[in-house]
Amino acid sequence: MKVHMIGVGGAGMSGIAEVLARRGHEVTGSDLKESPYTRRLAAAGVKVYIGHEARQVGDAEVVVISTAIPKTNPELLEARRRSIPVIPRAEALARILAEGRGIAVAGTHGKTTTTSMIAHSLRALGENPTALVGGELNDIGSNVIFGREDLIVAEADESDRSILRLHPQAAVITNIEYDHPDFYASLEEVVETFARFVAGLPPEGHLVLCADDPRCRRLAELAPCPVTTYGLSGGELRARVLSPGSYLLFEGARKRGEVSLGVYGRHNVLNSLAAAGIARWLGHDPLEAARTLGSFGGVRRRFQLKGERSGVRVVDDYAHHPTEIMAILDVARATAAPEGRIIAVFQPHRYSRTRKLYREFGRAFGRADAVVVTEVYGAGEMPQPGVSGKLVVDAICETSDRPEVYYVPDQEALPEVLRMISGPRDTVITLGAGDISRAGEELLARL
């Protein structure tokens, strides 16, 4: 089949394009700008156009669009004019999952790392799955793992309810919190989306979910299939944390053994338990599955060490929600040099999220010694009156355990500010889903 993909340069779309091309489809794509993903697609034999023009649709039999594509896109308009079937990214993913035993990883936080851990563990156990991940695995430098066509692991996106298009055989739900205020008016709406997703699982399928999350626990009652629970405080698979990167695994009441991970943090302990739960569903020993993650190299922009110079450690993370930020700052603290400070550099992501969650952001940064806030990364949203990085700064200043706070709206000024306020033994961590990571890279160049 001839497939044209509009907005092919993102992590989700590029992965689907690679899988379709590998499976014999003739794939073309377009995006506004060149990126590592478009370059890799081109190297894989996919024709990628930079920019959007009607003629680039060619003789496609189906057109796939990403959620970022406006209705006025010339290629989309051309496909509509010619009555070429147009499907969203989630539908293309659903069709791939339907070709075999599909495993979808969902949740507000931790989807990318958990998907990667499942793929890593199943590969080590000899299952050889195909995996579509929303980020780049450090071990292979790609967001796609090619393996069996009848076993597929994929990240499921709840941000616009497109998760409801997926009908996997098994699913993981890591946690449920309020996010994506550009689409959901309340937490209840988010919960309802996950509930509908769970209700759609087949009776012969399986659900793995976090018992530490009360909203996840409620979903277990709705599942039409067997359920495996995991957690730190309860669940069939339970962990007792021993250090930032190790824990004792319990299966039911039985102590199984110690596990060491290749990544740090209580959140990654939970992610690894989810991976062990999926492996157990496939007939593997959960302890053996968890222990394979000792060689897990992590995911790009997930507590990624960018370098160390003049005694200053620079780390980058994708965290852009208050809960994620708290978890990452805890890891930074646990792995910091003695007496070293934690300097957080935050780029708020989306005006809608900043407006809804600025108070929660303020409380989250109480774990840092200093916070530098820059301007909001709009991610396609129009600016909103009164919504800027200053909103987060003011919220931090209102907290009782407030750190030093700096408001630097000009991102170009960040590296020099960071050079001036950081010193030996300090950890500087850039946080956000936009382009904040380059501030850390430029800081390293100046130290």
From Swiss-Prot:
Entry EC no(s): 6.3.2.8
Catalytic activity, reaction form: UDP-N-acetyl-alpha-D-muramate + L-alanine + ATP = UDP-N-acetyl-alpha-D-muramoyl-L-alanine + ADP + phosphate + H(+)
Pathway: Cell wall biogenesis; peptidoglycan biosynthesis
Principal location class: cytoplasm
Described purpose of this protein according to its UniProt entry: Cell wall formation.
Protein family: Belongs to the MurCDEF family.
The name this protein goes by in its record: UDP-N-acetylmuramate--L-alanine ligase
